[in-house]
Structures are given as C-alpha cells and as structure tokens.
Amino acid sequence: MAALYTSNAQLFPTHSDIVSGTEAIQKFWQGVITSGVKGATLTILDVDGQGDIAYEVGKYALTGEGGKGLDNGKYIVVWKRVQGKWQLHRDIWNSSMPMSGH
C-alpha cells in the first residue's frame, strides 16, 4: 500500500495524529487491515489539477466481515506526479458517523 504514496507523503486520519513517510504509512494501513476492515468503496466527486499536482475529492465507505458497514465519510487526496508516475502525496479523511457517546 505504501508504494502508492510519495516518499514524503502524509496521512491525516480521523481522530489520529499525522502519519508521515512510507514506513509509517505501511504500518498504519496494516493496522487498519488487522482491525477488521475488509473492503473500501471510494466515490470520486471531483478531480482537478495543474502540472504535477492534482486533487481528488470524494466519499468513502469501509466494510468488515460479511460486508458489515464500519464507517463512511469524506476525503481529499493531493496527488503528485513523481518521475512520470502519479502518487498520493497528502491523504486526509474524516468520518461522517457520530462519535461514540455523542
């Protein structure tokens, strides 16, 4: 998964600190998989850019075992073209579900 990101990429996950660099990003996504996330659906709402930078705006839905809905929300990704290859450079998302206890 980390291979999709630039070498100095950053994640900005819901309810979490910034995750920086490919090693930390790989560890983060491995933790997501270990936590029970089995699938993700992304719905792209907008894409635009110029030169070697582009952005993508969309919605996501995460599912667990048996297709059980785990989370849904929205995201923005900044893409960067590095040596002719588009990679994720900044990846931010947040849940649309209410926080527990609220």
Report each predicted region and the residues it spans.
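Short, low-complexity N-terminal intrinsically disordered segments enriched in polar/charged residues
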Residues: 3-7, 87, 99-102
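Short beta-strand segments enriched in hydrophobic/aromatic residues
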Residues: 5, 60-62, 92-95
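Surface-exposed, charged secondary-structure patches
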Residues: 24-69
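Hydrophobic pocket/interface hotspot
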Residues: 1-2, 9, 21, 25, ...
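Short beta-strand edge/turn micro-motifs at domain boundaries
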Residues: 72-97
